[in-house]
Amino acid sequence: MKFTDGYWLNKEQYRIENPKETYEAKKILDEEGNDALQTFATYSKIRERGNMLNIGNTTLCAFSPAKDIIGIRLTHFERKDKTPDYEIVTQEEVKPTVSIIPGVVDGQGAGIESGTATLTTENLSVEISLNTQFRMSFKYKNQEITASELNAQASIDDISTGALYPLSVAGSQMSINEVQQSSINLVRPKHYMREMLNLDVDTKIYGFGERFTPFVKNGQTVDIINKDGGTGSEQSYKNIPFYLACKPGIDENTGIYYGVFVNESQPTSFEVASENVQRVQFSTEGESLEYYIIAGESAKDVLGKFNKLTGGSSLPPAWTFGLWLSTSFCTDYSEETVMKFIEGMEERDIPLDVFHFDCFWMKGFEWCNFEWDKNSFPDPEGLLERLHKKNLKVCVWINPYIAQKSPLFAEGSEKGYFILHEDGEVWQWDLWQAGNAYIDFTNPKAVAWYKEKLRNLLKMGVDCFKTDFGERVPMYDAKFYDGSNPAGAHNYYTYLYNEAVYEVLKEEKGKEEAVVFARSATVGSQKFPVHWGGDNVSNYQSMADTLRGGLSFLTSGFTFWSHDIGGFEEETPPDLYKRWTQFGLLSSHSRYHGNVQYRVPWLFDEEAVEVTRKFTKLKVQMMPYLYSQAEKAVKLGIPLVRPMFLEFENDPNTYSLDLQYMLGDSLLVAPIFNKEGNVRFYLPKGKWTRLVKDEGMEDVLESKGQWFQENHSFLSLPLFIREGYKVEMNKELKKASDYKK
């Protein structure tokens, strides 16, 4: 959200006030009883006592929840805000210190000599100027990594929506009595808080959740608001108000790596070197703004600290790393279809670990009723038993809505389990299912009711749930049970939804067996794996978009990720199916799914069967490597599928690569995005050993840090083992579920 008109001017609709200097600083205790720093930054310089009248100030609090992490809370007016709060995990061993070197002021409070107020936690500090021009500097190991300069922070009124003061007196020295006696009708305007942090030369920005726009975010406007917009626009299912800033170094001691996490669940807007090309600006509506600076030795170190700060990742069970096969969405399927597909995979010697039933396991117009459509599945208990005897896990589709035709609608409405309009009527619309109502997950009784419906399915034999949707949540004219601000509850809704589902899975299956297959996400959702990339399109461009979105998501605090192999929308041509199969089975989680087309390989061609068999077996055989890497990634709080620069931080060439990636520490994967098999990929310096290859290809490529161009059949792609690393394999494994540590 831009407030300025170029470099010099503000947009006419905004009244912008900035801290000009820090008038006072003091040491306080934070909520954990640790030392914190509080300052009062005034909107004009204090040169005499008269300057203390008719001006505002920002109260700034600096605190530390964990080592090398500093939180900043900016407050204009104190408000009793009902915006939901993300979970912040504090470290008991953190011991921040506060140092205040006061400036010198004269008898009227005017600054004569500047001072500093500093909070330090481990290797990170924030230093705020006192009694001089406002500046706030963040230093890691005594090196400045970013700063908030004069006029960066701001308290902003949108005077097109109202005014607390007559416009003629805004910024004037009119007395309070004169203001109160004014005959102008005053309406509270929309108010925003803003911060801008410096960007050093050659600093690249990543993150913000799953975004399908260019991988490096410099130059972009990013709005943090969950939307169901597919994979082909700037909208995102998984918005995370966090960015990773990286300035490549020439060695491990010279790079700069830090993250910025804006701890606001309501929509937040970022201008990434766009409104001001030397800064990242972020803002949110309201009277306060809280953010955290997270510093580290490396980009992986920063991501790990952010991951742990917001709850840490959970490890999904081994069977989830195998192949998932779906009924697809709008296809015609029944018990007969399902068994035909499963038997077809067996006959063709293709390992299968999970079978997924999409929406129409329930009757249309009744999602969700949590009951099998007996016309298509007359004996669901028997069907689930037969699937389990084939050593398959079963996933079924759900969403957090109850359609009006569902038998559950009347009960939910009567008992107050749905989000309401402000007038008390149930909030409904016809988008998706007719008369959709939203489960109100802020109501504990509604959560228990919803979980009980899922519990019955788990007792029947269902193993996990695809938690679809969670983005289209009302932001206006909406009332939540706990009084949550709808603007903040919108993004937070997916957390409560997936938390409820994950909890019942843990209760019934145990934590080691709990897994969801989720589309939407917010801060902290990494606790509820796995997430998939949403509704992509069946073409090579969308395949590339999917990878780019995944890498963006995985540089935002998440560990595991999947996508619809072959694309979701439209029909998939055989060549795309085969290329995407390679890519999909070299992701952390692998699922065939579509909209109007089945995704079993023999419906494409016989070579598709061969490709699916080869790469599914390869992934199963790599389970010792994949699962050990998954455990390590969870422990460190880093992604399993990761962009190249996370592993090669001293190689500047890796920082823009978004068409290849590392799968764990050892494996480099370069998917092929065309029918012909032409691929161009970059190998960092060293020797790289092929794991698969076409006939005639050399086993090892030695790179000086250079690009290579090759042509591959559908049975091969650039898949290399890094020099000095290994990939543990077990060729005796038949399925991922067979893997035991």
Residue ranges of predicted features:
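Flexible loop/turn segments at secondary-structure boundaries
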Residues: 79-81, 249-251, 267-270, 329-333, ...
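Catalytic core of carbohydrate-active enzymes
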Residues: 502-515, 521-532, 545-549, 553-563, ...
